[in-house]
Amino acid sequence: MGMRSLAAVALLALLVLAAVPTEGRSLTSKEKEKICDAGWECSGSKYCCNETISKLFQVYQFEQLFPKRNDDLLAHAQQFWDYHSFITASSVFQPLGFATTGAKQMQMMELAAFLAHVGAKTTCGDMEVDGGPWAWGLCYNHEMSPSQSYCADDFKYPCVDGVQYYGRGAIPVYWNYNYGRIGDALKVDLLHHPEYLERNATLAFMAAMWQWMTPVKKKQPSAHDVFVGSWKPTKNDTEAYRLPGFGATMNIMYGDLICGKGYIESMNNTISFYQHYLDLMGVGREHSGDNLDCAKQKAFNPSAPEYDA
């Protein structure tokens, strides 16, 4: 997903990210924002379809989805994540279609799908704890015991001396080139200061939403695209078992770290978060959609062994 300059977005980001010591932030794109054409645009914006996220998804629902994130004993990011930070971040991406595409059910499904990735990647729970793993999303905001610095040779985004690029954020970001790429998009110097993602929850959510809304490579779909149905698979995609649905979002986000490996635990766990959140949000897992898994899918972007996170 490309994004052209938005004055309102720039102003909003400057205000909400004032705590991060960096220059003004605006999202840029060569691609026009999607204009609603179904008669359900939000008041005041022809780009915002149906309800805004804050009307669809309220604070009590956020608390239902992430009830243990501030647990005194087990949570590692107590008092970091909150509803306000999520809504503030989402307001930047709503005009681009994030959870504002389609009718209300699709909007709720996309929220559940995105937050399922967040919950699965940040949980500190297991089947033995109160509520199971699904109650413990947003327990972390960074990788606790990094096994490496995640520094790779890259001409555009070279590693900064003394900086480690381990996982941080709502959907953890790894590797110097990913911090550089996301930082460029958000106009934040994440290459020199990746720690911003564990210091500012709004920025951490924005980085996750940017990953959701943005293709890894040109001429590929984003996770948003494959989920809401705006992507049409080619013959090669079909032969690679890549079809629209929640399964393809895992393919785009994680590639062959999860997909094409059969029904492995990490894939099944992410699906279980999605279905659990659908239930909590009143949609119901019976509306999970087709092509839930990526067990047989070939990766859009096969990973190099040294880049595995």
Predicted regions and their residues:
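Cleavable N-terminal signal peptides of Sec/SRP-targeted secreted and luminal proteins
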Residues: R4-G24
